[in-house]
Amino acid sequence: MSPDPRPPAPLSDSRLERQLADAKPLYSPGEAVAEANRCLYCQDAPCIAACPTGIDIPTFIRKIGTGNVQGSARVILSANLLGYSCARVCPVEVLCVGACVYNDWHRYPPIQIGRLQRYATETAFTNGSAPLFSRAAANGRKVACVGSGPASLACAGYLALEGMAVTVFEKRAVPGGLNTTGVAPYKMHAEGALAEVDFIRGLGVEIRTGVEVGRDVAPADLVREFDAVYLGPGLGDDSSLGIPGESGDGVAGAVAWVERLKLEPGFRLDGVRNAVVIGGGNTAIDAARELARLGVPSVRMLYRRTAADMSGYAHEMEHALLEGVLLIERAVPASFTRDANGRLTGIALADGRTEPCELALLAIGQAKLGALARQFPGVEVDASGRIVADSATGRTGNPKVFAGGDALTGGELVVTAVQDGKRAARSIAGALGVKVREDSPMHAGHE
């Protein structure tokens, strides 16, 4: 199967994402301590309840305030092994920060929990010399994880800490899933995601890149050779509209386009003065903001309903509008228009309007990977292509196979994928008869 367990080659400095700066820069030590000391350390902290992984937020903030940054990072990463990327990509405005009691007073801003979490974890990754966690003695159990996105990495990390030999199979040359290939660069560059992958590797996880399950290794072989298998392959290719003129240069899936922006050396937007993004979710908003931040003069989002119907977060859309993105409501694409040379010139709408563009990005969803899941004996998928599994344990119809993340939910948050992976790790440990240590990070956070 030609696996490559080595870390990927360094990323090129000529990647277009390098032009996009942090929207929320890393705190300095003084800024972090000052912000931490505003926290009221609520006894029944609503921020903890609002965190899908149940990080003990008041405790990690208190440790920052007292200068114990390594201890702060340990609190965070116990409950959420991907707490670094979650600090940068979570919609904290509707999770922990949105639940902060300061919001009720309207006099002071809420605690910037995400930025404090980033400060603690990034500082620990950069400056920490002592390991954050100890690993249990090897117990002879072997687990395979399919995909290297947040759900699989979380599951793999927690299991490795309890002495299991965990191998992650990733079809791409670069691991990390959408954290590496799909996160808006103004939230996190690919280097940040890969630093977190290195942290997971350091827990004892083997990551084999360039190995596609179903092509290079048979699913039935994984089930036979490993004591348990975790399916966290994420989602597939961008969905298409299926309208005239769609095939050809200038029209691309938003997820695939962002991957080029983040990873492809020398990728540029030469000649693009008018761009449209079709869709109303968070992927569409991120893509539109990226285009605006890269200097495209006219960026428009086309959405088939109204702003009130959009699935994207309102606070993200507000930022997009402030950055110059125009939202066009009730815009139903009918066809793409091209000149005699095949170059994209615009998009015709069902109501007769035409929007000029040299670039159109489709952010209308992604394919499910049901065909891959069906290759695992005993694993079923529903009519939409999602894997069928117990929501509490992640166990599928095959008692040796567990699942989670976007392949199970259809696409949610990084932090919910991490929680899926953590739940499944607990279930796998129990199914394999592994006694989890009392002080194991696997016990931290929400059940």
Language model features with spans:
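C-terminal catalytic lobe of FAD-dependent flavoproteins
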Residues: 16-18, 35-38, 342-345, 353-381, ...
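Feature captures the FAD/FMN-dependent oxidoreductase FAD-binding
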Residues: 137, 142-146, 194-243, 335-346, ...
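Phosphate-coordination loops involved in phosphoryl transfer and adenosine-cofactor binding
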Residues: 139-142, 210, 271-275, 330, ...
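N-terminal Rossmann-like FAD-binding beta1-loop-alpha1 element of flavoenzymes
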Residues: 143-167, 284-292
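Rossmann-like dinucleotide-binding cores of NAD(P)H-dependent redox enzymes
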Residues: 165-168, 172-203, 207, 288-335, ...
